[in-house]
């Protein structure tokens, strides 16, 4: 697409207040596209002049209709419940990920928006089983096989998005073309979700062990994911013969890497020691299961942050990686090489890193003691067999 064509475009990015949505918006703005960011919270970063931010909620159809009217493409990146304690807020996850996606599709139809690119996840296929060189021909994970509501709802949403491809727009003005990008774990300078949790664990002395049997996984640098989204939007146009319409694509940096070794440059670059202790996956999974069980009972009075959830244990401790040939062949996606060293340098330059103070490793000990005590109390409530 030429720069003059882009200058005539208006795009809306749901989830535009988040790390990826904001970065995608800035990149499109630099290419001359008129960008509107839509989110329930404002971006942490300064907005370049010319980018518009609209505060709103994907659970409101009327708000979505107002913001997407006149747009030529919507990037639906908004979601909830990817990690941490958010993963245990089941009703909110359902409302945002499923009903929010239904709303944005309906808003596009009602206001004649012809294209929608949906940001999906590996988790629509992966649920703890080993996958090597998977591709888009693999079936969705059965609904009763998910251990977390985020992955289940992202699957329901993706299925709906692809089903609504070629849906007729209002007043017979054309058709809605949709596609889905199944992204690997995102990383990059300033990433706001996963990397800060790892750094927080380092600061508290809680990153003491790894687990699993050489788990091979994939990641995607934010700039590569941005490139994939822009290419996907173009592949939904008549100029590209709508080649991406109704299609899912796996998106990553390419070759799989050991999940924990991938973060070694970050850990050591910030001055911490990389752990040498390795636990069995089953033991860590049981601990995560116990943590979730306790959270279920006491979250009304103490909505604590779990160290790990079951889905996170699977995601980080079980081998799963996918081919990106379809995205390369149909979208022209060619991931550029990036390293975690650059990311570590960014965090170091922004004040992160080991300080000249004693690491409070007893955080982990107290968390374990807390979980054990609550378990004892809960077990004491169970009826006896007598």
Swiss-Prot record:
GO biological process: steroid biosynthetic process
Gene name of the encoded protein: sdr42e1
Binding-site list for NAD(+): 154
Enzyme Commission number: 1.1.1.-
Catalytic residues, chain numbering: 150
One cellular component term from this protein's GO annotations in UniProt: membrane
Paired cysteines (S-S): none
Localization in the cell: Membrane
Family stated for the protein in its record: Belongs to the 3-beta-HSD family.
GO MF annotation list: oxidoreductase activity, acting on the CH-OH group of donors, NAD or NADP as acceptor
UniProt entry tagged with the keyword Flavoprotein: no
Protein name: Short-chain dehydrogenase/reductase family 42E member 1
Pfam families cross-referenced by the UniProt entry: 3Beta_HSD
Its membrane topology: Multi-pass membrane protein
Superkingdom of the organism of origin: Eukaryota
